[in-house]
């Protein structure tokens, strides 16, 4: 699995999000509560396959190291011929712990 570190992702975002797609693979309410700036959210993997080009540079993330959603999405994309996919395994948990900016309402469903 091709991984990207917190520092590498921060550097990519600082250069500008136009050269890659940052994709959060979590539910709508989780996305609304908080996400990494510049992220888009995919409802289903089928929707992701339609929205993301196989030649695009893609970074997938979820809530953190204990969540398997990003790893599952990574495997599906790779199996469908997407070569430039990386997984940010640290997810929101590591991003927030590093003190980097988040977007969203901050309100989580209980």
Language-model features: locations:
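Rhodanese-like catalytic fold shared by cysteine-dependent sulfurtransferases
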Residues: 1-21, 28-60, 64-110
